[in-house]
Amino acid sequence: MEYVIENTKTTSGTREIPMSDEVYACFQRIIENRKKVKTEPMIDGKCGFLYLDKNDMPMVALHWEKYFQHICKKYNSIYKVQMPKVTPHVCRHTFCFNMAKSGMNPKTLQYLMGHSDIGVTMNTYTHIGYD
């Protein structure tokens, strides 16, 4: 498998995302508890990836899709009320929807989601209107 770090689709896709102290601490724990590797993988001059696969390479979208499928399958084998298909992109939609519903400023949400057009944030992701 060849690893390539691609640019974002739009310039607004490259952004700094604020995080709380709790989120920062969570990322620190992930890094501290991550399996120690002999050589840190470097892809296109970038290193410090949070999650590595069994070959000590960065986890990619396909890894996460499979991971989510496994979780849903295991959950559904245990519980009567079935969990619908969940993907990382569904989590993105859910985040956007919940932030909109909680009253986050639409322009702030647009920035966080990396949308160049506020219409994408308002129509595609939120499924609710701002009053």
Model-predicted regions and their roles:
Residues 28-29, 69, 123:
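Generic alpha-helical structural context detector
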Residues 17, 33-42, 46-49, 54-111, ...:
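Short, basic (Lys/Arg/His-rich) helix/loop patches that form interaction surfaces
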Residues 25, 97, 127-130:
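Active-site micro-motifs of SAM-dependent methyltransferase domains
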Residues 8-11, 87, 94, 108, ...:
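Ser/Thr-centric signal marking residues that sit
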Residues 1-42:
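Conserved tyrosine-mediated DNA breakage-rejoining catalytic core shared by Y-recombinases
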Residues 113-131:
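Catalytic-site neighborhood detector that most strongly recognizes the C-terminal catalytic loop/helix
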Residues 3-5, 102, 127-131:
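DNA/chromatin major-groove-contacting recognition/catalytic segments
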